[in-house]
Amino acid sequence: MSVSIIGVGLHPFGRFEISGREMGLIAAREALADAGLTWSDIDFAAGGSRDGGHADALVSELGLTGVPFISVYNGCGTGGSALLTASQAIKSGAADIALAVGFDKHARGAFATDPGEYGLPDWYAEAGMMVTTQFFALKLRRYLDDYGLDARLLAEIAAKALRNGSITPHAWRRKPFTADEIANAPMVNDPLTTYMFCSPSEGGAAIVLTSTERAREMTDRSVELRAIEFRSRQFGTFEVFSPSLAPAITPGATVDASRAAFESAGIGPGEIDVAQIQDTEAGAELMHLAECGFCEHGEQAKLILGGELDINGRIPVNTDGGLIANGEPIGASGLRQVIECVRQLQGRAGDRQVPGEPRTAFTQVYGAPGISACTVLSR
């Protein structure tokens, strides 16, 4: 049984004077309204949050209908795991209409994480590896050296993100910067400067799903979820909050998840019209582009400098500004990616609309400790 998306809702990302739960509620109600439904029509729900509260407790405001509501958490992949759980409920026949929701409200500053939560010893944190800016810079420096890539590409990626964010109503960072301004900004962890990173933020996102057959009866603008795949790390990969560093690095979870998603959907990266790629920092987008199959490792410069990733390019990436412009409320971030693709495929993306009526889309989210969720969508 195939599954389709019939409604989406998004609370803007940034900093707000309301709770994370309230943002999740706003997103859920918007998704229901977008689908032309009420909460009583939902017979399964899944959701997650790191710091915003318990997702299943949203029923207190949405309505005490007795609906099965599964709370999930997989770090930055939480939205992906919520969507996977909801879609599997439909595929199995356990549900007719399902809701996936994610939200968060993080404290200012970098994430503070206890290494013991990930089964890691204290020395890993004492070495500074629990500081994500330091970890990603270390991984990126090796990648740039291995493939002979110029660090200037990172400034170009961040400039694209902030340029797209400046025309996105729900984005947090709405001020564009040039690549020169970004490259010359204060260094955080070499080679990454201030504006190359995303920041923990706040927001909510929700998606309503049903079977593709039912969706066609309900609306003429449904988007098919052709594939959703979730993978964890294998031995030998170098991942955030995972201390393994083998001499020969094994392909990571993103490679496995993206390959599985494309195989399940029956199409390849070359057939994708618009994509949302995890950009925790600019280097993440650089690496994930190749891991997802959009180019070979070391060949990213052609895509980036040639404008092929721009909204008017051959394969527009992070059309709403990605994490760099939106920030990352962990529970909502992966669902935001999918919602952006849904709106692009429906022609509802406003000033950032990809031209030419895109028909296929791809999303990829990555998180600790080395997990990835990927989707393929189509109209």
Predicted regions and their residues:
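Condensing-enzyme catalytic core mediating Claisen C-C bond formation in acyl metabolism
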Residues: 1-17, 156, 187-256, 306-320, ...
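Conserved active-site "lid/cap" helical segment
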Residues: 1-77, 143-150, 172-181, 191, ...
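Conserved active-site and cofactor/substrate-binding residues in soluble primary-metabolism enzymes
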Residues: 18-26, 53, 77-81, 93, ...
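Beta-strand segments within the central parallel beta-sheet cores of soluble alpha/beta enzyme folds
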Residues: 39-48, 68-71, 98-103, 152-159, ...
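Conserved catalytic cysteine-centered active-site region
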Residues: 47-101, 105-124, 128-136, 173-199, ...
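Short glycine/threonine-rich loop-to-helix capping motif typified by GTGT followed
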Residues: 52-61, 235-241, 279-302, 329, ...
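Active-site-proximal alpha-helical scaffold in enzymes
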Residues: 74-104, 133-167, 207-213, 326-349
